[in-house]
Amino acid sequence: MSEASGKEHPLSILMNEAYQVFTDLGFEIATGPELESEWYNFDVLNVPKDHPARDMQDTFWIKEKEGNVLRTHTTATIARAMELAGKEGRIPAAFISVGKVFRNEATDVTHEMQFYQIDGGMIGENISLADLKGVLSHFYKKMLGEDVEIEFRPSFFPFTEPSIEVFAKWKGQWLEMMGAGMAHPNVLKNIGLNPNKHQCLLFGGGLDRIAMIKWGIPDIRFFYQGDLRLNQF
């Protein structure tokens, strides 16, 4: 009997597919630290000091490094990349990042304390919400098939204005996939850019949920339990 061999994790497969979709559109891959400063994780993104996302029950704060958190999203990485692009005079620019994020929350079939998030941003002149919807529609069709049902709904986030949420049909119900919108003027100011000159679209959501729909995996927690049934990938 032959020995079992290791295989690429489905989330690694999906990460590479997602990167390919966006690099084909001209996006650059951005990387950043998992141990993030409060400034980039919250302040840059116009998150108020009293916002519940900053609470201990939602965020892992690091006692040994005051003012640092385990990043709750990779939007912080996109903010860093856009800030550097502005300093180097490389605008227009577009960035994509996939990485581990951490939330101090209860787990269930669609929520986990650690998961992979995909975040992106595009900055330049004359960028609109129509561009954002076009980019995201293209992405989900490439990842989930041309017949995937996608819906955009108005929402609110402190770092975007206007804001939308993206939903996909899964098991006959709408599953929230991503938050997105046009960067709030304060976000652009915080990274040293002029909101009267530049517009920026931002989007971010769980990579794990895309995998659940793509491969019919019923529980997000399976990805992190060493389940041997994932060997099929």
Predicted features and spans:
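TRNA-recognition modules of translation machinery and tRNA-sensing kinases, especially anticodon-binding
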Residues: 2-233
